[in-house]
Structure formats: structure tokens, C-alpha cells
């Protein structure tokens, strides 16, 4: 296992690397990796490429087939609005599906699940990746949360999220508070997440939450904000920026 700096990823892709695993948007900084380019580099070196879409599904246009990604995984409780405990998902490229064996076996992934055969025989296609009985309440919540996506243009959503995050950064820049931007300044190199470093970040975020403005803290000193145009607008950005001004940073 080799962990490298985000800016050095492409320099370390060579024929000694068998598998490349990346989060499309870094969970700390929001930095976006070029999925298509990195996947191509990986394939040229003979590596498989696995993408984690936890911080991009629901806010960025994702084109796994176009990028020729081998595998992808993600969650639905973030920007897909499935809520706590909602199901995860997995993608396997068609050229791999017949060769893949699930690491976790479950009766829902069995070829004939209701025969209750003592010998496991995997189903065909992506169905074999199912495990056991799901939480029906979580599935029901997710089903309704996903209904809205049929009528949403992801490219338009992405542009709107850039507008919101740019507005937020510009408003924070005007304030005389000790917040240091750690996300890329260029909006096309970050997801819809904006992160700052702050010495007393945990206490500061708790104070924001008390004002019903919910961001996130990650050790040792990062505070994170996500901007989904599905439920946020410009007035929300102005409100949270003004609240920053009224809160102490120490």
C-alpha cells in the first residue's frame, strides 16, 4: 500500500502499481481528481482503477463509462439525500462483471435465493453483489429521494453549485477572521465542498451548529461546508457568512 500526495498522483502511476484507489473529490479539501485522465494512465500501466464517489454523487456529472472506470463505490446519505443508514452502491464495468467474485456473500446475491441451498451459487451480473436483506425503511426513503433526479440536469446543477461556493468564498474573504482556505481556489478543481483550517475549528463549528448552520469538522483543524443547489440558495450563503462575522474564532 502506497499513499501519495494528491498533487503527485500521476507521477506515481507506473507498471509497479496494480490497483489505484481514489476518492473523486478529496474528503478533506474537496480537490477533484481527473477521473478520465487518471483512469487512462492507470490502464496504460496495467492497473485497475477504483473510484469512491461519496463526495461527488449528487453534485457532479459522473461519467464512469466514458472514463472507462473499472469499479466505483459510493454512498447515498450525502448529496443523494437518502438520510442516515441509507444503502451504499457499487459499479462494475461490464468487461469485469463475469470475472468478479463478491468478497461478502449474501442470500440476495444467490442465483436462486429462495431455494435456500447450502452451497452458494452467485447470481449473474451485478445482482451477485447484493448481500442480505436490506432495511426496507432506508430503501423506501432513498427511492423517494432519488425521484427528483429524473428532472435535474447535472451540468446545470454543477454550475449552480460553483456559483454558491464562489459566493461563499468571496464573502468569507471580506471578513476579518482567521480562516485559511485549504480547498483549491479554482472552482473547477474542487467539488462542491469548501474547507478552511482554523486552530479552534471544532469549537467554532459547534458554535455555528448552535445557530442552526450545520457544517462539519475534521481533525485536526478542518471545517467543511457543502453546497448543494437542491436545497441551498444565495440567501443561505449570505446568512452563514454573516454568522461567521459574529462568532469568535478563538
Segments (PLM) and residue ranges:
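Active-site phosphate-binding strand-loop segment of PLP-dependent enzymes
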Residues: 2-58, 79
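Conserved PLP-binding active-site segment of the aspartate aminotransferase-like
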Residues: 21-23, 191-199, 205, 213-241
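Structural detector of well-ordered beta-strand residues that form the stable sheet scaffold
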Residues: 50-52, 73, 101, 182, ...
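Conserved active-site segment immediately N-terminal to the catalytic lysine
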Residues: 51-53, 57, 63-92
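Active-site C-terminal subdomain of aminotransferase-like
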Residues: 81-85, 91-160, 166
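Conserved PLP-binding catalytic core of the aspartate aminotransferase-like
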Residues: 162-169, 173-211
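Conserved small/polar residues in nucleotide/adenosyl-binding loops
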Residues: 243-249
Amino acid at each position: 500500500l502506497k499513499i501519495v500526495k494528491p498533487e503527485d498522483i500521476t507521477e506515481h502511476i507506473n507498471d509497479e502499481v496494480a490497483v489505484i484507489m481514489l476518492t473523486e473529490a478529496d474528503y478533506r479539501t474537496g480537490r477533484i481528481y481527473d477521473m478520465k485522465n487518471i483512469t487512462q494512465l492507470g490502464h496504460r500501466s496495467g492497473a485497475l482503477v477504483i473510484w469512491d464517489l461519496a463526495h461527488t454523487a449528487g453534485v457532479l456529472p459522473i461519467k464512469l463509462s466514458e472514463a472507462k472506470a473499472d469499479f466505483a463505490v459510493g454512498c447515498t446519505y450525502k448529496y443523494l439525500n437518502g438520510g442516515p443508514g441509507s444503502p451504499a452502491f457499487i459499479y462494475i464495468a461490464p468487461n469485469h462483471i463475469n470475472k468478479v467474485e463478491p468478497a461478502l456473500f449474501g442470500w440476495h446475491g444467490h442465483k436462486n435465493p429462495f431455494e435456500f441451498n447450502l452451497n452458494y451459487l452467485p447470481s449473474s451480473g451485478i445482482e451477485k453483489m447484493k448481500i442480505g436483506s436490506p432495511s426496507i425503511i432506508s430503501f423506501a426513503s432513498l427511492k423517494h429521494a432519488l425521484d427528483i433526479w429524473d428532472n435535474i440536469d447535472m451540468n446545470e446543477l454543477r454550475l449552480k453549485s460553483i456559483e454558491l461556493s464562489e459566493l461563499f468564498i468571496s464573502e468569507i474573504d471580506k471578513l476579518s477572521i482567521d480562516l485559511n482556505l485549504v480547498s483549491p481556489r479554482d472552482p473547477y478543481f474542487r467539488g462542491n465542498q469548501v474547507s478552511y483550517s482554523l486552530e479552534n475549528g471544532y469549537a467554532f463549528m459547534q458554535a455555528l451548529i448552535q445557530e442552526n448552520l450545520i457544517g462539519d469538522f475534521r481533525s485536526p483543524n478542518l471545517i467543511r461546508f457543502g453546497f448543494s443547489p437542491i436545497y441551498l440558495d444565495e440567501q443561505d450563503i449570505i446568512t452563514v457568512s454573516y454568522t461567521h462575522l459574529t462568532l469568535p474564532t478563538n
